[in-house]
Amino acid sequence: MRICRSFLFLVKKCGNITPTIWRNQHTYKMATSASANLSKIVKKNYMELPQDGKVQAMYIWIDGTGEAVRCKTRTLDNEPKSIAELPEWNFDGSSTYQSEGSNSDMYLVPSAMFRDPFRRDPNKLVLCEVLKYNRKPAESNLRHSCQKIMSMIANEYPWFGMEQEYTLLGTDGHPFGWPSNCFPGPQGPYYCGVGADKAYGRDIVEAHYRACLYAGIELSGTNAEVMAAQWEYQVGPCEGIQMGDHLWISRFILHRVCEDFGIIASFDPKPIPGNWNGAGCHTNFSTKAMRDDGGLKYIEDSIEKLGKRHQYHIRAYDPKGGLDNARALTGHHETSNINEFSAGVANRGASIRIPRSVGQDKKGYFEDRRPSANCDPYAVTEALVRTCLLDESGDKPIEYNKN
């Protein structure tokens, strides 16, 4: 390990004394994409040209990884006022891990529409479901089943809020602002930190925040997280299927903002091994009954149901069936142990946290702290509804309708 021109600190790491080097911002030149060096002023000249009534609609979908998003744009003759006015489209699924080359056409079915913060009005962002050649949902299309489940319990008025954590990286995978071949100072000053030595990449955070508000995303806040170059934003409250729609588009916008700045936003639940916090997507959940007076009883009933179905939720809470979360849910760094279920008031080391204010008011919501940063919000919200409201039990979800 190369020693930076600064101070050597000894910090305690998992019971062992491990040397950690204080960051030196001049040690390492961050690797950025070549596209970030292109002139944005030149581009602006073209983006200000009139569109003569035409509209650019960017169709966005989740690819076969269940984590990455893809997009392409088509021209519309008029500004669409609703999803019903948007045409279906298609794409080559063999290039997105979603089909074989011999039968590669797949359908894009518009499902949610937002304002486009990059091209601006009247242009649109269009979130799409993916259907296979036989018009059955693609394996990565978890929205389809989520919408069915949400429609079954609409009279419960389920609200969700998801806390999306992410880590900023250079194009070489090195954490943004970290010195080369060593570490920044130990965790402590970065959470909600202010200052050049504590907040790494705030320009990206602010740009993303404003872009989401412009698009119509229910983005309710943001903050720097515990690890240097790690951030969080919160989406919600959203009712039913809207939670997944808004979180996926917020992720797309974050990737596009980072693309402009030439760096990467990673949703890996444990991007840096060792004595560093991982990244999650803590999910807040409530129903009308929970929010009304005396709602704590319904919260406690739901937690009891969740405790009996822990492994089912662990599999639903990351795209690799729990393997990603196994790196993050260690029982350390404000996480629960992946193999154990726990709950408590104001306990950030539990599977389920009841906020202190909820315990005092005897109503409100609870926070499921198990979903990973790269979770599919459709899978997470569907699993919560199945267990808490449809009273499902066992290791597999019930199939209510095959159509």
UniProtKB/Swiss-Prot annotation:
One of its GO terms (biological process) is glutamine biosynthetic process. One of its GO terms (cellular component) is mitochondrion. Its cofactor is Mg(2+); Mn(2+). It catalyses: L-glutamate + NH4(+) + ATP = L-glutamine + ADP + phosphate + H(+). Keywords: ATP-binding, Cytoplasm, Ligase, Magnesium, Manganese, Metal-binding, Mitochondrion, Nucleotide-binding, Transit peptide. The N-terminus is blocked. Its EC number is 6.3.1.2. ATP binds at E163, E232, Y233, Q234, V235, G236, P237, N284, F285, S286, R348, R353. Residues 142-403 form the GS catalytic domain. GO terms for molecular function: ATP binding; glutamine synthetase activity; metal ion binding. Mn(2+) 2 binds at E165, E225, E232. The keyword ATP-binding applies. Mn(2+) 1 binds at E163, H282, E367. L-glutamate binds at N275, W276, R348, R369. Residues 55-135 form the GS beta-grasp domain. Residues 1-14 form a transit peptide. ADP binds at Y365, F366, E367. Glutamine synthetase that catalyzes the ATP-dependent conversion of glutamate and ammonia to glutamine. Belongs to the glutamine synthetase family. This is Glutamine synthetase, mitochondrial. The lineage of its organism: Eukaryota, Metazoa, Chordata, Craniata, Vertebrata.
